[in-house]
Amino acid sequence: CAGTIGRINHEIFSLQHTEILELEEPFFMGKVGSSTMPHKRNPAVLENVLALCRNVRSIAPSIVESMVSENERDWGCFLSEWEAIPRACHMFGAALQKSKYILENLIVYEKHMERNLNAQKGLMMSECVMMHLARKLGRLTAHEIVYKSCMKAYEQEVPLKQILMQTPEVTQAFTEEEVDLMLNPHSYIGLAPEFVDRVVAKWENI
């Protein structure tokens, strides 16, 4: 459990980096991130949760060690568990409480997500283009064509669409509108909405 909660919070922590900033822990006016740099909005609560979860996980080895005991009653094991288990529960309880606060008040930056999706100027959608082209030219041929197009777009620092529209195999197979659709991240989310609905429905029934 401490691993799962830790990972969730670490993901939010990573996505709060200034250059990414897709998510942010709850913020309110008056919350100070630094005594010397007034602009800072540090992930203090997230850091607290990560430390708590790390400490809980560090207790696991001592509890595992208690599995080896002398016959049926080994007070050396009992005393170790009496100290380790309550300490782990207290810290994990605090981690859960803080995580609940974070998730219920999480700040989501949709515009930043959109910006990050388009940061590579379409390269992220190369799989979608390749899979569509594979239906017409075969998987290996399509992969080679899209690979070369991507490397050219990367090296020239231009949008992938610009290179694709200069590639005969692509323009013979698709219209410009179809290429635009394939390069649109919103059209390539698969079953993600269904998975989200399933998880939410399961949670509501708990």
Regions found by a protein language model. Name each.
Residues 1-57:
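Acidic, glycine-rich loop-and-beta core segments that form the ion-binding/anion-interacting portion
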Residues 35-206:
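Catalytic-core signal marking the mid-to-C-terminal active-site face
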